A protein has these predicted regions:
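Catalytic cores of phosphodiester-bond hydrolases, prominently lipid phosphodiesterases
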Residues: 1-178
Length: 178
């Protein structure tokens, strides 16, 4: 029992962001997801859990119509109103769109500058950044950390976890204030 209480106490201090990739029609899918989530008040009322919808999205102007526990994945090339931006949890983009072309690692200085400019613009909006469809290997993860990418997209969760632990850089475990 003591271990269970300890783990509960530890989870209170941690944040979880659940990124849901909507692949079907946005409005009906999100409406159904909201109905299901409302059955779990311990999730939707927990300020340490953020549910972010990516992929297919409803019109930006309707973001305000969704409950406070629903957030959206934004794009830098959109001109959001202040209200719409307040429902954006992060800004994501296709890695190859950011650098301008598909290229073998490592990148040249022009591509690195494009990536850094993108990341800086997102951070100026006060939002975390995620690059999707990016190289999924330690050299890329290291570069993303150096650039200030906030969320590393990966299909290799265990490898990324091992990489971060071996890197012994605890700053990536600090809770975000964003």
């Amino acid at each position: 029992m003591a271990i269970h209480r300890y783990l509960q106490q530890q989870m209170v201090l941690r944040k979880l962001q659940l990124l849901v990739d909507v692949k079907t029609e946005a409005i009906s899918t999100i409406d159904r997801l909201v109905q299901i989530l409302k059955k779990y008040p311990s999730i939707i009322q927990n300020k340490n859990i953020k549910i972010v919808l990516s992929g297919n999205a409803p019109p930006d102007s309707t973001f305000k119509n969704y409950p406070d526990f629903i957030w959206f994945d934004g794009r830098l090339n959109k001109n959001y109103t202040t209200s719409e931006l307040s429902k954006i949890a992060l800004i994501s983009e296709d890695y190859y769109k950011v650098i301008g072309y598909k290229f073998i690692w490592p990148l040249d200085s022009v591509s690195i500058d494009k990536a850094k400019q993108f990341i800086d613009k997102v951070h100026q909006l006060g939002k975390p950044v995620r690059l999707w469809a990016s190289p999924d290997k330690p050299a890329a993860w290291e570069q993303f950390m150096q650039w200030g990418v906030d969320l590393i997209n990966t299909d290799k969760i265990n490898d990324l976890a091992d990489f971060i632990i071996q890197r012994n850089d605890c700053e990536y475990f600090k809770p975000s204030n964003k």
